[in-house]
């Protein structure tokens, strides 16, 4: 028996998130159906992260066991032949039988795209958050520094989530001005709470429009109260960019 790790990209627009659910279209559901056609048996997959409805991925990691005598390139080709056109397997690698994509991950990198322009761009409306009000990039960069390091991110978790351990370590947050009015927010950390990155982006935008000062990020972190933080940024601007092991 082999264990394969697949590096997967997908357009999350027409998926109800990654995790398999009954009677709705999910990335994991499509992935497992493709594997079952190839392997002729039920297959359970494990991923590095569970993206929400509308969230995209460039480098999601999906792991599964295979009883066929098949090489990596042949498995990649077989999977892409059986997957819909909004999922693409970029690479397949054989890994140790004890490898676990969630627990062995050392770093997860998320990208969030904002289209900062007075006029919308219809061709990227599913792939970036259109924000028509001017954003102060320098202030957003200053604010981003307050997220770095180990903090209790209870103020930036999903509302209604009652998990006890909400302490997370953020390695780096970068705010980059790209061409064409695109702002890229890059967040790196080992693990994240649900909606955490989108809530962080919402806070940075609040700083960008001048409603908060950069140091208000630190104040809200200390409050440990989701109701005191900013609104959640929409899902379609978020990408699981890469996972490092």
Curated annotation (Swiss-Prot):
<comment type="subunit">
    <text>Homodimer.</text>
</comment>
<dbReference type="InterPro" id="IPR020094">
    <property type="entry name" value="TruA/RsuA/RluB/E/F_N"/>
</dbReference>
<dbReference type="InterPro" id="IPR020095">
    <property type="entry name" value="PsdUridine_synth_TruA_C"/>
</dbReference>
<dbReference type="GO" id="GO:0160147">
    <property type="term" value="F:tRNA pseudouridine(38-40) synthase activity"/>
</dbReference>
<feature type="active site" description="Nucleophile">
    <location>
        <position position="52"/>
    </location>
</feature>
<dbReference type="InterPro" id="IPR020097">
    <property type="entry name" value="PsdUridine_synth_TruA_a/b_dom"/>
</dbReference>
<comment type="similarity">
    <text>Belongs to the tRNA pseudouridine synthase TruA family.</text>
</comment>
<feature type="binding site">
    <location>
        <position position="110"/>
    </location>
    <ligand>
        <name>substrate</name>
    </ligand>
</feature>
<dbReference type="InterPro" id="IPR001406">
    <property type="entry name" value="PsdUridine_synth_TruA"/>
</dbReference>
<keyword id="KW-0413">Isomerase</keyword>
<dbReference type="InterPro" id="IPR020103">
    <property type="entry name" value="PsdUridine_synth_cat_dom_sf"/>
</dbReference>
<dbReference type="GO" id="GO:0003723">
    <property type="term" value="F:RNA binding"/>
</dbReference>
<dbReference type="Pfam" id="PF01416">
    <property type="entry name" value="PseudoU_synth_1"/>
</dbReference>
<keyword id="KW-0819">tRNA processing</keyword>
<comment type="function">
    <text>Formation of pseudouridine at positions 38, 39 and 40 in the anticodon stem and loop of transfer RNAs.</text>
</comment>
<dbReference type="GO" id="GO:0031119">
    <property type="term" value="P:tRNA pseudouridine synthesis"/>
</dbReference>
<protein>
    <recommendedName>
        <fullName>tRNA pseudouridine synthase A</fullName>
        <ecNumber>5.4.99.12</ecNumber>
    </recommendedName>
</protein>
